[in-house]
Amino acid sequence: MSTTTIIRLHRVLRAPAERIYRAFLDAAAFSKWLPPHGFTGTVHEMDPRVGGSYRMSFTNLTTQQSHGFGGRYLELVPHERLSYTAIFDAALNLPGEMRTTVALKAVFCGTEVHIEQQGIPAQIPAEACYLGWQESLTLLAQLVEPEIRQ
């Protein structure tokens, strides 16, 4: 039996790849769209370069309990691909390292987004990850799809 899970997601967003890519590497944008419903996010550190690191926490709005995680950027191909790791804070007792890979491809109506997350600890149900990512991707779409020129 596997001790980790892999999930894969696919969306098409009505936004250019450049804007979606930026939303993953801009601290204010990342903290706005990544936390799933019911959580706020805080980026404590973000050095978006290969080998650079980030630290972030999610806070449950109801209970005010926070959990932190962070990792390193493994691959950054502007407007096309990025890959980063995530390790949960030790207090959560969720061992191992997750790896998230995002591939962006321009299509006639926007950008195709493929996300693969590997190494999800067995204690986290895959369906909970899918739900969280679906909520996050809805928030990402709301951030990157509007064409605000001013």
For the regions a protein language model found, what residue spans apply to each?
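Hydrophobic ligand-binding cavity/cleft-lining segments
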Residues: M1-T40
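Structural motif
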Residues: R14, L76-P78, V107-C109
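Short amphipathic alpha-helical signal-transduction/dimerization elements
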Residues: L25, L137-E145
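Short, highly charged C-terminal tails/helix-capping segments
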Residues: V43, Q142-Q150
